[in-house]
Amino acid sequence: MAYAVVDFETTGILPAYHHRVVEIGVTHVEDDGTIRGRWETLLNPERDLGPQHIHGIRAADILDAPTFADIAGEFAALLQGRVFVAHNASFDMRFLQAEMERTGAWLNGGTPSLCTMTLGSNFGVGGACSLVSACGAFSIDRHLAHSAGYDAFAAAQLLRAYLGGSATWPGWPDYWRQASDAARHYRYPELAQRGVTWKPRPQGTSAPQSFLERSSTGASRETVTGAEAQYIALLDRCLL
């Protein structure tokens, strides 16, 4: 067990303002970079869908979709024992915390997590902090981009490229090993698994290109890290 790469599509950017997760994608990646499994589902957010032009999900798509509470047990089991990985992980972690709290569960502090966006500065990605730009730097195909399932799979392939590229770099094998070891000892809330059927997004549907994808063709790559990278990623979610 090693990594659970996650992507959320949401009704907005601030869980404190009652924005909710409307789609989950999870891809498992092993220590050696092998991709072991993929899961995804639309979710009924129990509110309006927010900016549908961003996530591309229609009201008809979620009529018989489960709620987060319906699948929280199965989702937590997919995360258990694995490092939580996402592109702009701080964004997804905030929503994970908020959604878990709505079920009456609380995450223990110090959830082991990695951010493929932040890590990119170590692998020649530079300021291309969007997922599509980072994947482009490694020739990773993003078929049907902007669905949670495909974005999680794309980020998983990006993580695999990082793992392979750093296998012989001084200090990096220990870095990955320590993250994986921490995850093995971390406990997610143990929630009842309800056995509710997951509902993937209909095949062939995706959201439009993001603002940065439409406007960054041929843009130079400057080094952007930390808070700057997170700000740009947040801006990208707003400017569609």
Residue ranges of predicted features:
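An acidic intrinsically disordered interaction segment
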Residues: 117-125
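Short secondary-structure boundary/hinge segments and terminal tails
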Residues: 21, 70, 118, 152-153
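Acidic, divalent-metal-coordinating active-site segment for phosphoryl/phosphodiester hydrolysis
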Residues: 11, 147-161
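Short, surface-exposed recognition loops or helix-turn segments adjacent to catalytic cores
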Residues: 110-114, 144-153, 172-176
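Acidic two-metal-ion nuclease catalytic site recognized across multiple nuclease folds
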Residues: 160-240
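Short, charged low-complexity intrinsically disordered segments located at boundaries
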Residues: 57, 105-108, 126-129, 148-150, ...
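Conserved non-catalytic scaffold segment of RNase H-like nuclease domains
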Residues: 1-112, 124-146
